[in-house]
Every structure is written in C-alpha cells, then in structure tokens.
C-alpha cells in the first residue's frame, strides 16, 4: 500500500526536518476525501490498542489523563499529517487546518501509533475534527458508565463516527 511507504518516507524526512507541505507539492493523491467527514477506509481502516480490553477499562481509558500516557508526540504525528494531506489530495495544504486524528480514538483504546488509525481530519466543514471529539467523549463516558461495551463503541466509531451515537443508542 503506497500510504505506508510514503508514510515511512515522511517519518524519516520529518525526523530530519526536511518535509514541508506546500501548494507547490505535485503528487497524485492515493486516498479519497470524497467521503468526508469520514476517512478513506482503504487508507485509514482504524486499529485497536491490544493493551485496552473491556476487563481493564477502569485502569486504562476510564482513568483521567490516561490518554496522555499513550499519545504519540507531534514529532511522530506531524510528518504523518504532512504526508496524509498529500495522500488525501486536499487542496488546502495548511497543516494547521487539520488534526492528525485517530479514527479509533485513544479514549476508546485506539492504537496510538498505527498509521492505519491516523489521518488528517479537517477543522473546516459542517462535521469537523471538533465535532468528532465530542462524539469520542460521549462514547467513552458511556463505556465507563457501563451503558455500552467497549467493543460496541469502537465498532460504531470506526464504521461511521457521524452515526456512532445513534447506532449505540446513546445519541
């Protein structure tokens, strides 16, 4: 898959401080942004952190501040974001206009460093990265309260975050 090869290059270049996204970048996109606000599932299928299970949620995701212990640094995510903007073929190449987001959020035990779980989610539009953040929090709160299972929350947000609250019955 080209995204992973390009991502590997982006990581190496980013670590060396050599990558930049600009309007002059002329590369063909490999991922589609036609389904926005959802990512292209062939490029961003989502991934789970195997260290988070239903049986340990009260010592992982339900602990305040836990996501900070697993969140990758921007030195890791910024090169991925830069390459993802190219891969998704976004016309706006300003990195500040995107969040390098986890499709399956860390709040629900998403894989922190899996490139297939990260994508440049726009801050613009009717359903944005900020909108998804609210969905993530509501799902995590429902999981921690025992209203829904971790598996149900993960599946719903991975399949379509815009309908996840309705699908799980908490929206």
Question: Which residues does each predicted region cover?
Answer:
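Nuclease and nuclease-like effector domains acting on nucleic acids or nucleotide cofactors
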Residues: 2-98, 107-171
